[in-house]
Amino acid sequence: ERNEIVLNEKNISGCIKMYLDEENLLDRFFILPTIPEMTNIKDFERAIKQINVDYEIQLVRKKDLLKVQSEANRNTPLAISSMVKIIVAACIYKEISEGNIELSSTIKIKAEDISVLSAGIGKQNIGDLFTIEELLKLLLFVSDNTAMDIFIDYLGEDKIEKFLNFEKSKVENKGYKFNFPLTKNIYTEAWCTESNSEQQWRNSAMKKVVWTEGLDYFIDLDYVRYSMNYLLNNSWIPWDDIQNNNVIYKGGSAPGVLSCIWSTRNLEKEDFLQFLFVINKRAPFSLLEELYIFGCANKLLDFYGVLKVR
């Protein structure tokens, strides 16, 4: 048996479909936002405008680049959260190309390396050896903050800035300074200053908006796109080791921040496509809003034949 609850949240709507078992108990349920038609980047922008947000959206299709952005952030970059890890990964690949390190090079985990809110490496790994290849997988697949800090500490802000300046000739200069603090520093200040349990930290990190206080990574999407292209030019990237890797995805999220990139693999192909966006809101996104945004993105990608929405 199926029951349905209608959802209405300001300018977006949807429903909860609940399926009951033979004993009339809840078996499963789905939250389904109402998704408008998606045939181009303007449709996606129009849909995003239904939520009170700042945004930047980019689409590369048939070697043409389309950009749209909200008026409020014309001259300032938005917070991109963990999507910054694509840039850090590209910097590591540049180090590899210059012969300074190898994918097989190892790093021993020290106590001071361990970040907060980490998704992979923890205190149990102190003293363990990780290869650069393993750290790249942790960085890009599970968005591991400790892997990020190890790479930032190895590179130093100078090498990251040098890499970004290398790309700056292709990017409009908005006159801001690159800033890449350790995740341990920025996220401790954001959510972990009180001596509470990690469970309380993680709860705070799901609810408390801090990008408005400058506690995030702020950078133009152009740098993310160029960094992804730099990754694609390498003979091996972490996505090579997983199935169904014809489309690469990396996202980032924090309260009030959503950022994503989808990219096909071959830069030289006529049908090469990249779709990326960053959306900033001064309050946490509701679950319906997040599902709505991703539903709109998936529908647009499905229209272009990149993803199949079931």
Where are each of the predicted segments found?
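C-terminal and inter-domain tail/linker signature
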Residues: 1-45
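Structured C-terminal helix/loop/strand segments within mature extracytoplasmic catalytic/sensor domains
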Residues: 33-54, 67, 158, 208-310
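Second-shell loop/turn segments in exported
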Residues: 34, 71-80, 120-126, 134-138, ...
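Short, conserved catalytic-motif segment at the N-terminal edge
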Residues: 51-78, 93, 100-101, 264
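Active-site SXXK
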Residues: 79-107, 139, 275
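Sec/Tat-exported extracytoplasmic proteins
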Residues: 90-100, 111, 140-143, 155, ...
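Short, glycine/proline-biased beta-turn/loop segments that scaffold the active-site neighborhood
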Residues: 98-125
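Active-site-adjacent helix/loop patches that line small-molecule binding or acyl-intermediate pockets
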Residues: 126-204, 219-222, 230
